Amino acid sequence: MKHHTRITQAVHPGLKGWFSRGFRVLSLVFAAVLLVSPDNGYSREPAGLPVLGISVLQFGTAHWELDHLQHRKLDQKNGYRLDLKLVANLPASRLAVTSGSVHGAVADLLWAQSRFQAGTPYLYVPFSSQIGDIVVPEASAIRSVADLAGKRIGVAGGPDSKGWVLLTKVAERQGIDLARDARVQFAAPPLLNQALKREQVDAIVTYWHFSARLRGEGGWRSAFGMADLLRALDLDPNLPVLGYVFPSEWAQQHAGLIERFARSLQQAKAELAGESSHWQRLRPLMGQSTEAVFEALRDGFVAGTPAPLTEQRRGDLQRLLVLTGADAEALMPETLFYRSPP
């Protein structure tokens, strides 16, 4: 340090300012070179594209298609940049969108309806028609709703979960009160899987991807699916009960961006449905699994690709909301259900 000081003191006073200015100029030039260098990540960032921020569960099923969308640059090809905020749980994802730290998130139909009734409407862009499954041991005699009477039933979530509500509605039509005629316990899906394996319950009402894991492991089967329950209630079995939600006012102001996002989603879903090799890259996001479990998850995801949201399906979504307890006089209007332009 003393040696450096002596050198500085030896410089003519009139040259000190020149050296200082020269150093600043060289620093700016060096920074500019870094920015345009082909090895710098920012140089590959498309300039001027609008950014769409979405919160998604790190190990959630929506992350599969959004990661593929980014990997294939379908966002950039459609004129925007997708920015994912990975979160650990559903409350964190909902908080991200309600607080405005992201533009959108994945939510189910009932959440979107509850926000509408609370005075904060969200635009609902269909994501998946997968609701869940009723899973039993392979050798079980349970094959219908009526067979559940007197049985021990594990239910994912709480009493207001869509699967349980639909199941009880169908049972009521058959003169069965499952809350009275069966032994019901509510728990998290992983705990229900373990309870089924330990023979602590006879059947579980669970989310589709937990059902897929069980069936992929072998020894378990679907007694009947949620699609069967929807049919029994005279509803279309292919209803998008999960969607990407965006604050309605913001979505109206950015209608073009929403349209680009929806178009890139359709492209991602089509690629994942049409080419199984795309899924190999996604395996780390799908958890440790055998080949059979992996295939069950892949096939289940593809099977949940929503059909076009026709007038009838939008009407059925509203009827589904009424069945699950929503106020029939305060339903989400059809304008909050996104529909791709022709």
Please report, for each region that a protein language model flagged, where it lies by residue:
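N-terminal secretory signal peptides that target proteins for export/translocation
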Residues: M1-S20
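Bacterial N-terminal signal peptides
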Residues: V25-S37
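Bacterial Sec-dependent signal peptides at the C-terminal "C-region" and cleavage site
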Residues: L35-P46
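Short, glycine-/small- and polar/acidic-enriched structural segments
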Residues: R44-D177, Q185-F186, D202-W208, A223
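Short, solvent-exposed loop/beta-turn-alpha elements that line the ligand-binding surface or hinge
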Residues: K77, D228-P237, V302-E311
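Pocket-lining segment of extracytoplasmic ligand-binding domains
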Residues: L109-L110, Q185, P190-R281
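Secondary-structure end/capping motifs
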Residues: A251-A326
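Conserved C-terminal helix/tail region of periplasmic/extracytoplasmic solute-binding proteins
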Residues: Q318-P342
